[in-house]
């Protein structure tokens, strides 16, 4: 079975939007509800997409197990968005901070505590976060919903898009396909993180990923 090139699927949509924008003097871009996992991952995604969409970043990450870590990451997200808006990189970017509810993550993770990073627990975590994104995107009348998660080389972009497309059908709102790591997207995010001096964590967020990462460092 042929694999879907989600970057090319995204480019088709963006090219159509660009043509519409060039053809209309009073063009108003579509509204995108973009789930963001963290500022570093969002840096390239926002730079790339803010020329085509009115973006509202949805910061919803109940997988972050430690409240101090959560506060640090959400503060960096807000700081990056403020910097981008000040520089007028594209259309203005807004942000909605979701509830910090790690208990929902732990309830979801029951029975999957020993899954390796990148396994079924992670897939259930993607669904948890994207489900809330789709729900609020539909309620808010957005034109699309999406996530920054596909920028990571450690994340399964095909699985993320599969979940997003399923939720699109369930909630009746278009999913914006992506594989942001393509076309040097991940490399660009590292450069932007350095440029804006963003805090760049070395684990995804949950206590399980933190423990696995610490074990890797010890055994290196």
Put a short name on every predicted segment.
Residues 49:
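Aromatic pocket-lining residues of Rossmann-like dinucleotide-binding sites
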Residues 1-44, 52-220:
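Nucleotide-activated chemistry modules centered on ATP-dependent adenylation/adenylyltransferase
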């Amino acid at each position: 079975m042929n694999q879907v090139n989600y970057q090319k699927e995204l480019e088709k949509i963006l090219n159509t939007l660009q043509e519409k924008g060039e053809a209309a003097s009073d063009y108003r871009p579509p509204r995108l509800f973009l789930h963001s996992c963290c500022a570093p991952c969002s840096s390239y995604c926002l730079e790339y997409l803010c020329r085509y969409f009115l973006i509202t970043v949805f910061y919803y990450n109940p997988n972050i197990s430690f409240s101090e870590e959560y506060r640090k990451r959400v503060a960096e997200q807000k700081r990056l968005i403020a910097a981008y808006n000040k520089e007028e990189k594209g259309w203005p970017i807004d942000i909605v901070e979701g509830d910090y509810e790690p208990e929902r993550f732990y309830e979801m993770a029951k029975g999957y505590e020993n899954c390796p990073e990148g396994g079924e627990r992670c897939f259930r975590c993607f669904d948890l976060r994207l489900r809330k994104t789709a729900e609020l995107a539909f309620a808010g009348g957005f034109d699309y919903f999406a996530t920054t998660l596909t920028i990571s080389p450690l994340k399964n972009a095909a699985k993320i898009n599969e979940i997003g497309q399923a939720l699109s059908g369930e909630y009746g709102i278009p999913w914006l396909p992506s594989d942001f790591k393509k076309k040097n997207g991940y490399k660009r995010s590292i450069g932007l993180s350095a440029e804006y001096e963003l805090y760049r964590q070395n684990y995804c967020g949950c206590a399980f990923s933190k423990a696995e990462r610490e074990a890797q460092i010890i055994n290196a």
